[in-house]
Amino acid sequence: MFKILRDDFSNLKWTGKVHLLALALLFVGVVTSKFLLSLGMIIGVGSLLMERDFKAYWIEIRANRFFLYLIIIYLLCFISLLWSQNLPYGLHDLRVKTSLVVIPLLLIVKPLKSNQLKNLLLLLFVSSIVISSLINFAVYQYAMSKDAIYDVRQMSLCGSHIRYGIIVAFGIGVCVHYYNALDKYKFTNVVVISWLVFYTYYSQVLAGLISLFIIIFLGGILYLIKKKKEKLVLGIVLFTLIITGFCCYALFVPETHKNISEHSDLVGMEKSWSVRSTYPFDSIDNKNQILKETLVRYLDSKALANDSIGVEKLSEKDIRNIENGYADIHETESGLIARYYGLRYQIHEAKNPNGHSLLQRLSSWSSAWNITKDHWIMGVGVGDVADAFVLQYEKEHSLLREENRLRAHNNY
């Protein structure tokens, strides 16, 4: 294999070798570094301009309908500058969106003909995911042991934990797709898949879990359709719908909790708490939640009385958990169980959206919908999107703090 790979690389023109380098930087940079990603785009565009085979580029572009749709969307954003008042922001936003066009352009206009070189790029992609995830996990475990980190979302050192979680799911999909093609490396492939599945589970990134589920589900369905197993496909679809319905029921059906003022000895709790912690009883925890409410719910989750004796029975680790905003002992666990209880708390108990990813996103979506209703034909223009959100948040007297008043979507 390595001899074939070496021969394929040797047969490339110098511009082809530069283009391959650019693609390698893209495949590594999309996982680990914006700098490498930007460098790959610059080198890639430069190699295309040096080769100057514009006729061949145009043929490839015309043959790819998906890329044509991307160009149309980008052009519509550009045209919206005509009715944008904040031109500097609009130009900045278009510059950021350029990567959505440039990266597909580099992959489409000069496709690699060698399967070995394609596999090399995918190997770089998966290797970057494995190495970065191992570093993330090791650093997180060390920081946890030193009480320097209290939120699993801080585990990603490569930018957004949501974006990284989705990339990990794609990496698993690549490994599964090439499982049968790697006869000599099946054991290694199984180890890599197992590690990345564990990382996805442990990191609690809901977008990553959903992406992994979709990849496995659609991949399995397409495989069974190819094998003409229609009845099995129908059974899997029905089973998936039932499980999805059960999960939604488990999340959204509320639990009954006792009222904090009627069933809690707040005076006794405050006296014992002041001995155990430096955080004032009437203050907020590290997730900006009312600390005494976090304490009551944490005591409930451990089946302890809401009084001074219950507080005294808490361990030092429990005290740190409460200070860090964990309202349920189950939230301190790893994986889906912790995420499940965290989501239930957000849906049924949390009154302040700050510090809660789901509630912050729902609040932003609500503001975005109201902006859309006011400008449903032409929009506000790409330059005025951020300003429109600022005005809408003020108009609605949003509970979101200024640093959390973001636009309602991520560009991926």
Residue positions per predicted region:
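Juxtamembrane membrane-water interface segments that cap and precede transmembrane helices
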Residues: 19-25, 145-157, 400-412
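Transmembrane signal-anchor hairpin modules in multi-pass inner-membrane enzymes, especially those
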Residues: 1-85, 116-119, 123, 178-187, ...
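Alpha-helical transmembrane segments of multi-pass inner-membrane proteins
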Residues: 24-27, 78-82, 116-150, 156-291
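Membrane-embedded alpha-helical segments of multi-pass membrane proteins
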Residues: 35-51, 94-105, 163-172, 210-217
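Aromatic-anchored transmembrane helix interface
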Residues: 66-73, 87-110, 120-124, 129, ...
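Membrane-interface micro-motifs in multi-pass membrane enzymes
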Residues: 31-37, 92-96, 155-169, 204-207, ...
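Long extracytoplasmic/lumenal interhelical loops at the membrane interface
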Residues: 322, 336-341, 347-374, 378-412
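Membrane-embedded glycan transfer/ligation machinery
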Residues: 22, 37-40, 73-76, 100-101, ...
